[in-house]
Amino acid sequence: MRIFGRNTPNNNQDAVRLLAKACRRFGRGRNRLLAGASALGIIVLCTVFSIAYGKMEADYLQAARGNGTVAASSLERGTMEQYHAIQELDYVDCVGRKVEAGLLYSGKEGISGLEVVDSVAWEKMQTPAYTHIHGNYPQKEGELMLSVRALEALHISEPKEGMTLKLSAVLATGQREEIDFTLCGWFREYEDPGISLPVGYTSEAQVQKWGMSLEEPDLLLICQKSTIDGYSVEDRLYE
């Protein structure tokens, strides 16, 4: 570089290198801070969404247990034609059938409702609302599955599969029948004891003996897909 006709040493390249080096050091620190802030933000967002999702799941489970089923809607006295038609609806996840057979008594004390449901209703709608499920759903005539609350009403604290329960069944048809049931399982339910009796389940073979059938259900139980709520499903069904 020439100044006033003389050659002056040029240190611009060294200065540029020093500035570039300093910028890189500063940039690395800034990038680390930005990366750390971004990672922290992602972690916080994930935590918030996880907590919110967990609360939604907990509220859903609590509501299902309180209702005794995860079915969000139902259709009374639905026909098999309606049953098959509902299965084809794009906003319905699954459909189950239930027959309300009657009530069970020990002496004069009502201890449990008596129902039969199909495999879809049991596995996808009832089981998720219960805990401590032991044994299997009734398959044979005379088999019975009771809630722990009903067993406690019978003063049974240590139930065993295969034990005999002498009970009276007051049927929906108006009949009363003394039956030696065989206990095939039990479960814990969470419905409000001040509102309703616990539910018990018997086999389809048993209710057929009484002249009832899942081919003529009292209720069609419906689980809708997540894109629609239960009230909207019922409104559409009754249109």
Can you name each region flagged by the protein language model?
Residues 29-34, 40-68:
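Alpha-helical transmembrane segments
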Residues 53-239:
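Basic-flanked hydrophobic alpha-helices used for secretion and membrane insertion
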Residues 1-46:
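N-terminal Sec/SRP start-transfer signal
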